[in-house]
From Swiss-Prot:
This is Inulinase. The lineage of its organism: Eukaryota, Fungi, Dikarya, Ascomycota, Saccharomycotina. GO terms for biological process: sucrose catabolic process. Changing N393I: In strain: CBS 834. It comes from Kluyveromyces marxianus (Yeast). The gene is INU1. Residues 17-23 form a propeptide. It catalyses: Endohydrolysis of (2->1)-beta-D-fructosidic linkages in inulin. The active site is at D53.
Length: 555
């Protein structure tokens, strides 16, 4: 949420050919081509105004709807008060209907800052009667920021999350702090005969602490513990979240041969400013939660996404399969978010991702536990009638590359690349021994994304600086060239693997089947979208492409 200083999973559903925006009570659908500068098609954007953190994510089991709320200033394309929760709904986590402002702060000089949504099935709060289906008893837990105070408030909905009533005895949690925000609440079942209760993770931001509270009714909260000065601190903690995540196999710190449980707890903490790439970043800790205290399995700092534009991750409450963990993040960075060259909206969300814990071989001699990410999209609809292009078993030469020309480019596509480095004794003498893919604009090929792998550096790179948009040249925080470790997917065959989604002005890269991820925005001129892909290397026969498949999305 806005900082304040006191100083690949296919889902059945509707076609994603139109993002249906509804705002200010107007039910007229607005297509993604109505707006300027290449609005994304499969990443949610507000119809107009400013957006940042995702809030209040939940699944309505009665209507089979996914609900997304978000930090929203409808009056401008920069952050400002009054700040609301915007609201969008989807059947398939791909095509969204935007309902505009849903929950507000109550005064023009205040903000309804970030928070979460729970379903109060058993009416522990006393807000509901039998007229409200238990599956739709939505309660928002959020931060009211007004003047020097930040405190936790609750509001409830009697119509399935479209409108809200504020609790008359707010605030429910106030510690007399100006930096106390972003509550994430979940239900924790009791153990050993104890009753279940609500658990809140909330940031006391500028003392670098996540506080854990418990409550029987969402109104009265008791401090249980804190998680303080862990990981990468930056300038402050924000947007904490605690969730139990399933895994295939996890390396535990005891090296015990005993059988392991089928899940572990993951604590998310976002920091801004002060991320290792500059500005915003989200980290996570793997561990155990006993109902009062979170204990990490080790002292590592793990980052959820290695790109520049992935912040304030929040997970959904009440997924259809309770073991599944889905989440979404804000796809921007506070270093330049308010200057990004889009209009009449500013900012997009990431794709929804499904998270699991997996063993990950960072080198041939060791393995570690990481949070694996898989994009969640309605692939059946997106790939229907979409055009696919393929290259197989191609050894790249320095004289002749490969070129793919996209028919009727939409700007939204997926690609999957598997390649090997063939090796050479004198390759270290080459200044930059790269395999490069140039994703070029269809109307002006002087605007392009360049991405690929360089063997001497042992990393994948992205260059997003080749554009005529002044913002990209003038804002020095909009880092042009970025690198991320691209792990070998198979140390025996030396195969590298990367899956990518490009959507108008955002690219998400999933390395080693999602064990490493990088999300970054980029900006081309209006109506100049990816229309051609060139594959090149300056070093003869250093790389072989086992397969490269590109599919344009049906949007």
């Amino acid at each position: 949420m806005k900082f304040a200083y006191s100083l690949l999973l296919p889902l059945a559903g509707v076609s994603a050919s139109v993002i249906n925006y509804k705002r200010d009570g107007d039910s007229k659908a607005i297509t993604n081509t109505t707006f300027s500068l290449n609005r994304p098609s499969v990443h949610f954007t507000p119809s107009h105004g400013w957006m940042n953190d995702p809030n209040g994510l939940w699944y309505d089991a009665k209507e089979e709807d996914w609900h997304l709320y978000y930090q929203y200033n409808p009056a401008a394309t920069i952050w400002g008060t009054p700040l609301y929760w915007g609201h969008a709904v989807s059947k398939d986590l791909t095509s969204w209907t935007d309902y505009g402002a849903s929950l507000g702060p109550g005064s023009d000089d205040a903000g309804a800052f970030s928070g979460s949504m729970v379903i109060d099935y058993n009416n522990t709060s006393g807000f509901f009667n039998s007229s409200v289906d238990p599956r739709q008893r939505a309660v928002a837990v959020w931060t009211l920021s007004k003047g020097p105070s930040q405190a936790q408030h609750i509001s409830y909905s009697l119509d399935g999350g479209y409108t809200f009533e504020h609790y008359t005895d707010n605030a429910v949690l106030d510690i007399n702090s100006s930096n106390f925000r972003d509550p994430k609440v979940f239900w924790h079942e009791g153990e050993n005969g104890e009753d279940g209760r609500w658990i809140m993770a909330v940031a006391e931001s500028q003392v670098f602490s996540v506080l854990f509270y418990s409550s029987p009714n969402l109104k009265n909260w008791t401090l249980e513990s804190n998680f303080t000065h862990h990981g990468w601190t930056g300038t402050q903690y924000e947007c904490p979240g605690l969730v139990k995540v399933p895994y295939d196999s996890v390396v535990d710190s005891s090296n015990s041969s005993d059988s392991k449980p089928d899940s572990a707890w993951v604590l998310f903490v976002s920091i801004n400013p002060g991320g290792p790439l500059g500005g915003s970043v989200t980290q996570y800790f793997v561990g155990d939660f006993n109902g009062t205290h979170f204990t990490p399995i080790d002292g590592q700092t793990r980052f959820l996404d290695m790109g520049k534009d992935y912040y304030a991750l929040q997970t959904f409450f009440n997924t259809p399969n309770e073991k599944d963990v889905y989440g979404i993040a804000w796809a921007s960075n506070w270093q330049y978010a308010q200057q990004a060259p889009t209009d009449p909206w500013r900012s997009s969300m990431s794709l929804v991702r499904q998270f699991t814990l997996k063993d990950f071989s960072t080198n041939p001699n060791s393995a570690d536990v990481v949070l694996n990410s898989q994009p969640v999209l309605n692939y059946d609809a997106l790939r229907k009638n979409g055009t696919t292009y393929s290259i197989t078993n191609y050894t790249v030469t320095s004289e002749n590359g490969k070129k793919i020309k996209l028919d009727n480019p939409s700007g939204s596509l997926e690609f999957h690349l598997e390649y090997v480095f063939n090796g050479s004794p004198d390759i270290k003498s080459n200044v930059f021994a790269d395999l490069s893919l140039y994703f070029k604009g269809n109307n002006d090929d002087n605007e392009y994304l360049r991405l690929g792998y360089e063997t001497n550096g042992g990393a994948f790179f992205l260059d997003r600086g080749h554009t005529k948009i002044p913002f990209v040249k003038e804002n020095l925080f909009f880092t042009h060239q970025l690198a991320v470790t691209n792990p070998v997917s198979n140390y025996t065959t030396n195969v590298f693997d990367v899956y990518g989604v490009i959507d108008k002005n955002i690219i998400e890269l999933y390395f080693d089947n999602g064990n490493v991820v990088s999300t970054n925005t980029f900006f081309f001129s209006t109506n100049n979208v990816i229309g051609e892909i060139d594959i090149k290397s300056p070093y003869d026969k250093a790389y072989t492409i086992n397969s490269f498949n590109v599919t344009q999305f049906n949007v």
